[in-house]
Amino acid sequence: MEGNVVLLDCTLRDGGYNNDWCFGHDTLIGVFERIVSAGVDFLEVGFLDQRRTFDPDRSIFPDTASVAKVFGGLDRGRTKLVGMIDFGTCDISHVQTRAESCLDGIRVIFKKHLREPAMAFCRQLKEMGYIVFSQLVSITSYTDDELMDLIRLVNDVKPHAVSIVDTYGLLHKGNLFHYYEMLDRHVDSDVAVGYHSHNNFQLAYANSIELINRHRDRSRTLLCDGSLFGMGKGAGNAPIELLCMYMRDNFGKDYHVSQLLEAIDANILPLYAKYHWGYSLKAFVAASNDCHPNYVSYLVDKKTLSIKSVNEILSRLQGDKKLLYDKNYIEQLYVDYQRHGCDDSTAYEGLKILLAGRNVLVLGPGKTIVDERPAIVEHIAAKNPFVISINYIPDGFSVDAVFLTNSKRYNQQVSAITANAASLKLIATSNLTRTKGEFDFTLDYESLVDRSAVFMDNSFIMMLKVLSKAGVRDVALAGFDGYSSDRENYYASKMEYDFVKRLGSEINSYVDKVLPELGRSMSLKFITTTVYKAI
């Protein structure tokens, strides 16, 4: 067993997705020396990418000559050094022969539609003397027939290894064993089989040791990847220190785990505090929907959807689109999901009756709702308005209705809404579903959004459109402060959106453009401080 399972550390390459490969020169050297001292079989020192310039603080290099500028003079012990090329990002002209390079091997990652030219590239690298690893990105996207075609190419080129790459952390043990057995059964016996895991389902380490144990009586070499403290893209990888410990304790391998722990303590934990990787809700949602994690990030970052809604949208992803991220595709799915068209004529008739002859005060979530409370209280005492808050129930104010457009905000307010159910009217857009029963008024979402706007479902503007259509003629506004990049924008920090500070000026400009148009049908008056222009 001892000789046919080997380990590869990919901290400096996969971990670099978290910090743009900017580890700092001292950390690069520190990690290198600790991995070598631990006796790990292979060390992946980073990416080869001709689009990048040389930086001694980064583990991403324009060519093989640049790798030697950082690592060339260091003692590598028994550890073999490899770099990685994402096929198409580093031309062969940027790669020296193995005799000229400090690298022993090169790993080539490629998606299935590029398998033929990528394997031809692997052949070129092999002819230059390198130990070559063919890395099957997104293994779960391969059908059995496609994998057999890839195996045909592998048996022709005969790289050092062909690796199962669970790019999105989708594999459970049964699926992993299926791919492993296909490779073990059909790939030339001189070619090693590799496994690169991701931790979306908290299975990276478990799958690795399951595979190691399944492989124990076979003569082929198995190569398992890991990284210090699991440092890697998104959900991260199998922790190399755990793999080394397992191999030491169960199979007599002489890895020095203490060296890895020193590297984690001195070099990796400070990075973890700053960047944080590992199992997360986003990683789980992506893996449970068998999809690219960017789809999840796109939807979650909208800050308008519940996780249930995110899952429902992701369930509509089709075919190869699931793992090949397409921003326009997910935007259209989001739009289609939110559309939920409905006939709201009866709802508007009801609102007209409810609001007939009333002044309306609309409360937003800006900090002035607290800072300028006396002005709001004075207005309520003088005008006795019908009070509507947007997507929240404010502390210290009695409201007559809540306008709901945002599923996430609604879920955060459910208990408060239930507590005030007897006296509170709920006006909701059709993209929301009530937890129990029906909303008092459900309005067509699609008719209220502006798809040309940077923030298409601006609840403030949507509210004003509703009031205009309901025949309201006198509207006071409080807590609509406008957005700023250098201060908190909400009275409660938990309501803050990350994108607001990035897009705040664009949102402000849009509101300034739309308010005069809405002001033609009704009087709009801000009674708290705002960045918006006077109407």
Where are these regions (language model features)?
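Metal-ion/cofactor- or nucleotide/acyl-coenzyme-handling active-site neighborhoods
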Residues: 342-535
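Catalytic cores and adjacent flexible loops of soluble metabolic enzymes
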Residues: 1-345
